[in-house]
């Protein structure tokens, strides 16, 4: 059963014996993602979120992924309970393997995504600190995960479908001169695997609560892999917000706090960060808020320069600051 409408969601809830037909239920579509249908359910004082995977993602290019990934997601969330505080990750309440659906707890009323806060000019360093702290815990404490689950999470099929293929391999088609460099980055992600990786560690997947703490969502790309991906992915989004908003000092402060609070060390971060920037310009899922062609070209130049970087491990914060200063003068 595909949950495309409010009425379909209500029928589904009744069929699954999750609500009684005579009881009023409020159903609201939650936007923001391209890979799933997500709905908020409110019944009396109870609030849940229902999520169903899409086979074809909602982007312009043809982009497909196995809907079984939704079950990887809720199993990862169950394991995360042993790593981070309960308040930082939703709890899984119901799983439906037939329709590729699961239901989880809903965040408190009034929360906003970190992305929305940034886009509205709210630059709170405590949010960056909270995000980095959660990521650090996931990376450093994931050795606690059940061994059988580690084996399952080592399968990178969904990661390939949702990240490597639409980002790295798609870029190779557009930039064949970067084939060797991008292939090296793919190899690092597939071979240097040391911990649980979120795979979609973006400000849009962080719900900021009233107390400033973050609720982390969207684990469908999670896998046992290289932690550099999560850092590059998040930093790329923060850099793009800086260029779009022209708030370089504010975003640099957030990036500095994020890197300082992470407290871990990853190798070869700058080339992976460059790849993320280029993917958000020319991959299968480019950001929709950067439209200025001259700015896009400047970002491409930064990205390619970093992807092809062969120098000793550079200071990432200094490299970001230099590019902010350079582009801010254009």
Model-identified regions with their sequence ranges:
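Active-site catalytic-loop/activation-segment of kinase and kinase-like phosphoryl-transfer enzymes
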Residues: 1-11, 102-105, 137-188
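Phosphate/pyrophosphate-binding loops and the adjoining catalytic core of nucleotide-dependent enzymes
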Residues: 3, 35, 266-273, 314, ...
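Short Pro/Gly-enriched beta-strand edge/turn motifs at strand-loop
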Residues: 17-25, 74, 162, 179-191
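Active-site acidic catalytic loop and adjacent metal/ATP-binding pocket
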Residues: 28-43, 48-50, 184-229
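Active-site activation/catalytic loop segments of kinase-like enzymes and analogous catalytic loops
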Residues: 75, 228-264, 274-292
């Amino acid at each position: 059963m595909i949950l495309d409408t409010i009425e379909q969601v209500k029928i589904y809830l009744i069929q699954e014996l999750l609500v009684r037909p005579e009881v009023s239920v409020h159903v609201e579509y939650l936007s923001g993602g391209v890979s799933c249908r997500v709905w908020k359910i409110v019944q009396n004082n109870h609030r849940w979120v229902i999520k169903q995977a899409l086979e074809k993602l909602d982007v312009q290019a043809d982009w497909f992924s196995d809907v079984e990934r939704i079950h990887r997601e809720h199993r990862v969330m169950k394991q995360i309970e042993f790593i981070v505080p309960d308040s930082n990750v939703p709890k899984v309440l119901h799983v439906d393997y037939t329709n590729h659906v699961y239901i989880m707890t809903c965040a408190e009323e009034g929360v906003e995504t970190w992305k929305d806060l940034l886009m509205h000019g709210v630059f709170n360093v405590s949010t960056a600190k909270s995000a980095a702290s959660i990521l650090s815990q996931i990376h450093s404490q994931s050795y606690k995960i059940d061994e059988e689950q580690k084996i399952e999470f080592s399968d990178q099929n969904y990661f390939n479908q949702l990240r490597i293929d639409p980002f790295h391999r798609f870029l190779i088609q557009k930039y064949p001169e970067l084939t060797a460099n991008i292939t090296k980055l793919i190899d690092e992600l597939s071979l240097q695997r040391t911990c649980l990786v979120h795979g979609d560690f973006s400000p849009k997947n962080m719900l900021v609560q009233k107390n400033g703490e973050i609720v982390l969502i969207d684990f469908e790309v999670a896998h046992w892999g290289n932690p550099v991906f999560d850092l590059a992915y998040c930093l790329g989004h923060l850099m793009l917000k800086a260029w779009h908003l022209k708030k370089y000092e504010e975003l640099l402060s957030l990036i500095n706090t994020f890197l300082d609070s992470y407290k871990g060390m990853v190798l070869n971060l700058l080339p992976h960060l460059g790849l993320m920037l280029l993917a958000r310009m020319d991959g299968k899922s480019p950001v929709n808020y950067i439209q200025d062609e001259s700015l896009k070209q400047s970002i491409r130049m930064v990205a390619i320069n970093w992807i092809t970087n062969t120098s000793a491990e550079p200071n990432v914060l200094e490299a970001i600051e230099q590019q902010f200063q350079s582009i801010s003068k254009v």
